[in-house]
Each structure stands twice: as C-alpha cells, then as structure tokens.
Amino acid sequence: QTWPPVEDRPHCKRCVACTLMWPPEANRCVCGDLVPKCHKGCSQCEKADTRSGRPLYKCLSFEYYNCAAD
C-alpha cells in the first residue's frame, strides 16, 4: 500500500503515513505522530514518554501498514 505525499492533507504535516479520507480535513496521521489515544485500526500502539506527564501514544503498525518498514 502506498501513501500519497502529506502536503495535500493538512492534518498530516509531521506524518510518516496518513489516512486517505475525504474531505482532506478528516485525515489523520497513521505513523510517526504522538496522539492521546491510538487510532482505530492501529494494531500496535506504544506509550511514549512525554515531559508533560500526560500519556501519549504512537502507532507502530496500522492495519496493513508497518510504520517501521520505511
């Protein structure tokens, strides 16, 4: 599965991969972002240490997309 460039999806500025939804505003990062909870479809979610003390999570594997494969 290939993911188009992030430029045309404003919510995916710092992503490794992004969802393919319409409208573009509905898109979310799949890999590489820190989120309060992992996305639906994230099959491997890892807690990330943050300085703020609030727990954040990052997705390591999203459905069929392996974030570490890049």
Curated annotation (Swiss-Prot):
One of its GO terms (biological process) is negative regulation of endopeptidase activity. The keyword Disulfide bond applies. One of its GO terms (cellular component) is extracellular region. Disulfide bonds join C12-C31, C18-C29, C38-C45, C42-C59. InterPro entries: Bowman-Birk_prot_inh, Prot_inh_BBI. Gene3D superfamilies: Cysteine Protease (Bromelain) Inhibitor, subunit H. The record marks L20, M21 as: Reactive bond for trypsin. GO terms for molecular function: serine-type endopeptidase inhibitor activity. Keywords: Disulfide bond, Protease inhibitor, Serine protease inhibitor. Expressed in bulb (at protein level). Belongs to the Bowman-Birk serine protease inhibitor family. Serine protease inhibitor. Strongly inhibits trypsin (Ki = 7.1 nM) and almost completely inhibits elastase. Also inhibits chymotrypsin (Ki = 19 nM). Does not inhibit bacterial subtilisin. This is Bowman-Birk type proteinase inhibitor A7. It comes from Hyacinthus orientalis (Common hyacinth).
